[in-house]
């Protein structure tokens, strides 16, 4: 039990340091010092700094999936979520987006991980690809799957689902970025988020105007 607690303290300390300064700028000795152990003792828990990083990636992904399960968001299984979006109201949709937005900003591990990856995407092609998969591609694929199902059910306009996903997701990611850089603007960003969600909802549910004859 004590060994597991020390392992978690190492992960927490490393994530805090990586998110503030970047992976390459932090040494194993600094992580050990933050935990309150000697550097050689750290190697009893992890064979290398990269092993610590990989464990952070794995643990954060597991935490995110477990936490978002509670609000019916399963990014790894879009089919599971389609019923939750069927006949959803604008109010219910905004509440779902608001919850995930605030969770992304205020959960310490999730927020720190995103900040770490924001730094590291410019330092390593491998981590740049991981950033794109984690924060762009899988989110777009998830929402495109939702829109594809809603189009097939005749619930929203039959537009390209991949383009709809970009139109829907991009402002949300932009507002999270604003709050990461300027936390004092959170109230403003929440208001903008609500305006975006409600406008998008209205646009995809409205019938397109009939074409006029020349």
Question: PLM features: what roles do these ranges have?
Answer:
Residues 1-5, 75-77, 208-214:
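N-terminal intrinsically disordered/low-complexity leader segments
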Residues 69-108, 165-168:
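Hydrophobic alpha-helical connector segments
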Residues 129, 133, 137, 147-199, ...:
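Hydrophobic/aromatic-rich alpha-helical bundle segments in the mid-to-C-terminal region
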Residues 9, 17-59:
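Helix-turn-helix
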Residues 83-84, 98-106, 114-122, 200-204:
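Helix-loop "lid/cap" segments that line or gate small-molecule binding pockets
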Residues 105-118, 125-152:
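Amphipathic alpha-helical packing segments from all-alpha helical-bundle domains
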Residues 58-64, 71-72:
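Short, basic, alpha-helical segments at the C-terminal edge of helix-turn-helix-like DNA-binding modules
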């Amino acid at each position: 039990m004590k060994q597991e607690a020390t392992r978690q303290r190492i992960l927490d300390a490393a994530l805090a340091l990586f998110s503030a300064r970047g992976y390459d700028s932090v040494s194993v000795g600094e992580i050990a010092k933050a935990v309150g152990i000697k550097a050689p003792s750290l190697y009893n828990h992890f064979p290398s700094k990269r092993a610590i990083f990989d464990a952070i990636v794995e643990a954060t992904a597991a935490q995110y999936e477990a936490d978002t399960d509670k609000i019916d968001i399963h990014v790894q299984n879009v089919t599971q979520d389609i019923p939750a979006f069927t006949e959803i109201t604008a109010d219910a949709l905004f509440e779902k987006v608001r919850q995930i937005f605030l969770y992304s900003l205020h959960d310490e591990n999730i927020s720190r991980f995103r900040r770490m990856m924001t730094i590291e995407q410019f330092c390593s092609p491998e981590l740049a690809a991981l950033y794109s998969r984690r924060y762009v591609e899988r989110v777009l694929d998830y929402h495109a799957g939702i829109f594809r199902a809603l189009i097939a059910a005749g619930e929203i306009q039959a537009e390209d689902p991949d383009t709809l996903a970009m139109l829907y997701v991009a402002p949300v990611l932009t507002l999270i970025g604003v709050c990461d850089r300027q936390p004092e603007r959170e109230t403003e960003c929440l208001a903008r988020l609500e305006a975006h969600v409600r406008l998008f909802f209205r646009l995809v549910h409205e019938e397109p105007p009939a074409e006029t004859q020349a």
